[in-house]
Every structure is written in C-alpha cells, then in structure tokens.
From Swiss-Prot:
It is found in: Plastid, Chloroplast. This is Large ribosomal subunit protein uL16c. It comes from Jasminum nudiflorum. InterPro entries: Ribosomal_uL16, Ribosomal_uL16_bact-type, Ribosomal_uL16_CS, Ribosomal_uL16_dom, Ribosomal_uL16_sf. GO terms for molecular function: rRNA binding; structural constituent of ribosome.
Amino acid sequence: MLSPKKTRFRKQHRGRMKGISSRGNYICFGRYALQALEPAWITSRQIEAGRRAMTRNVRRGGKIWVRIFPDKPVTARSTEARMGAGKGDPKYWVAVVKPGRILYEMGGVTKNIARRAISIAASKMPIRTQFIISG
C-alpha cells in the first residue's frame, strides 16, 4: 500500500472538496489516461487495486504511471469507544481527488488494450471516470 514515509503531523482535518482540479489534469507521461469526473477520497487500497488490475491486463507490454498519492491520514476510533478522549489514531491513507484529475496514465500499448485495461481499473474506483487520449 502507498503511504508517506514521514509526515510533519500525524493527524489532519477532513477539509472539503470544492471546485475542479487545478493541477494534475493533463497527460504528462503516457498516451492514454484515466480522468476523474467526481470529487472523492481514494484510498491507497483502491489505488493499488487499480494499478494491479491494469498491470495484469497489459502483461509485459506498456508502462503505467500512477499520478495520485495518498498523503492524507484518515483517523478512526474503535467501535466500542465512548465519545470524547480525543481524535482516533490514523487508520488508512487517502488521496484527495477533484474532478479533472488524472489518476493513471499508460503508454506503449495499442488503444484497444489501453481502453480495456483502464476500464478495468475504473471499475475499482469509487467515482465516475473517463478514458482520455493525449493529442
């Protein structure tokens, strides 16, 4: 699973996801990409599941770039815990994704293979996405 090696603070506020993505919304590395159409928190497990699905689908050919990184800790309390006594411990990590953000990129494969692999990865995501081609 992806997670930061070291952070300045252990816990973060939830924040809010307003507007569209102002960065990471152009294809930089590959030729094909998966772009988010809705705002969401995407967990490190979901990112990894999508990456594995794509890798398994393209086999040897092609290269895959993961363009998001989970850098926000999500805390949780145990189910039996009473109210109060502070914020819970970090449980998992999420990437904050806004509409327009590129999630994955792919290159070195044909359009059909890329579309199939990216659609499988898209099914692992908790949001609506679209397949885009650079150029």
